[in-house]
Amino acid sequence: MNSLYNHGIKQTQLITKDLSSFEKSLSTSPLSLQGSITTSLTAFKKTIREYNDLVAQNKKDESNAKHEARLAKFNQDLQDFTSKFDSLKKQRDQALQETNKQELLGRRHTTQRQQYGENPYDTGPTQQQQQQQMSYQEGLYKEKTSLARGTQQLDHILDMGQQAFEDIVEQNETLRRLQSKFEDGLVTLGVSQGTIRTIEKRAKQDKWLFWAAFVFTLVCFWYILKIFR
């Protein structure tokens, strides 16, 4: 249990470091940093589940109270990390939208100066020209907004993929434990080894189907990411 606890401590340190880097460079941080944080949070959740199982199995241990306190601290850390990560992502989206808006306004003023500042007899843009310029700027702004929404959707897809991966791993571990218990039960009931081997062979085939479906899922997500990028 101590080794698993130490592993969890290292994970909290890594997540804290990545969140700090993300906070310092919200608008310039790469998407890969967000992916790294999401992966670290998923791994930390798995560590907490495993640590919780060990604590439940050793309730009669004298040091169980200490481990329960550590488990509570891990759960609180996970909640704080998740809340801060969600908040930082929202701040990043708002900062990018504001930056895009300011860039569009700056381009608009620069274009107007270039078009009308060189002619001293020009009194300024006509109403039609202003409308055309506004339409152009609005089009650019809508394009930037669409790209920002696409980025948000991409983040959402990454989160969904990470959650699906976590669920698949958890289900695989559950099936493995059930298979072990099932085999022990068959031996207790006196089922022949040949029958057990047949069942294991069938289970292995199902496992290959499982991993094939998993690889297919990864390929689908890769194509989705490629389309969005």
From Swiss-Prot:
Q: Where in the cell is it found?
A: Golgi apparatus membrane; Endoplasmic reticulum membrane
Q: List the disulfide bonds.
A: none
Supply the gene name. Answer: BOS1
Q: What is its main location?
A: Golgi
| InterPro entries per the UniProt record, alphabetical | GOSR2/Membrin/Bos1 (IPR027027)
Q: What's the protein here called?
A: Protein transport protein BOS1
Q: Which UniProt keywords apply?
A: Endoplasmic reticulum, ER-Golgi transport, Golgi apparatus, Membrane, Protein transport, Transmembrane, Transmembrane helix, Transport
Bilayer disposition of the protein: Single-pass type IV membrane protein
Q: Which GO terms describe its cellular component?
A: endoplasmic reticulum membrane; ER to Golgi transport vesicle membrane; Golgi membrane; late endosome membrane; SNARE complex
Q: Which family does it belong to?
A: Belongs to the BOS1 family.
> Compositional bias (Basic and acidic residues) spans?
89-106
Quote the function comment for this protein: SNARE required for protein transport between the ER and the Golgi complex.
Q: Where is this region: Disordered?
A: 89-135
Give the residue spans that cross the bilayer.
Answer: 208-228
**Which Pfam families does the entry mention?**
V-SNARE_C (PF12352)
Which ranges sit in the Cytoplasmic compartment?
1-207
Q: Which domain of life is it from?
A: Eukaryota
Q: Does the keyword Transport apply?
A: yes
Any one Gene Ontology molecular-function term assigned to this protein's record: SNAP receptor activity
Provide the membrane-side ranges marked Vesicular in the record: 229
Q: Name one GO biological process term.
A: vesicle fusion
